[in-house]
């Protein structure tokens, strides 16, 4: 991240990553579907005197931000990267997301290049899905 970046964090969680982002970027918008996570993170960040974070209660899968961002960080996995996440990026912006079917998921960095996206595979992992972003159940015998 660059010092003048505006960042969107999807999945506030405990606020730890939010605090890290706030130290590195100019402005951070952090969204979470769980109000209790947001309240806990706000309280923690207030003790650190970080004033460049805006918290919003929202479902990432239906979220409609009022702006685009230099970077978007998704802290939970998705079965498939929603197209909307990509369009929240400014030209040259980067999206960090974990995609795939547990137990084999892939951390990706997508960089917006006009209407196209360069995709870099970073590592394999296995993390919990964002609420509502888990794969559909399939019936098998």
Task: For each feature predicted by the language model, list its residue ranges.
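Active-site capping/gating segments
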Residues: 100-141
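Conserved nucleotide-cofactor-binding alpha/beta core module
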Residues: 1-117
């Amino acid at each position: 991240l660059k010092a003048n970046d505006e960042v969107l964090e999807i999945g506030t969680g405990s606020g730890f990553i939010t605090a890290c982002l706030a130290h590195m970027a100019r402005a951070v918008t952090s969204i979470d579907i769980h109000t209790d996570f947001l309240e806990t993170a706000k309280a923690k960040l207030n003790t650190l005197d970080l004033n460049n974070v805006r918290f919003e209660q929202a479902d990432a899968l239906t979220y409609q931000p009022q702006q685009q961002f230099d970077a978007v960080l998704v802290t939970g996995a998705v079965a498939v990267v929603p197209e909307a996440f990509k369009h929240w990026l400014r030209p040259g912006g980067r999206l960090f997301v974990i995609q795939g079917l547990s137990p084999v998921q892939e951390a990706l960095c997508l960089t917006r290049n006009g209407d196209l996206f360069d995709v870099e595979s970073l590592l394999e992992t296995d993390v919990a899905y964002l609420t509502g972003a888990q794969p559909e159940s399939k019936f098998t015998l």
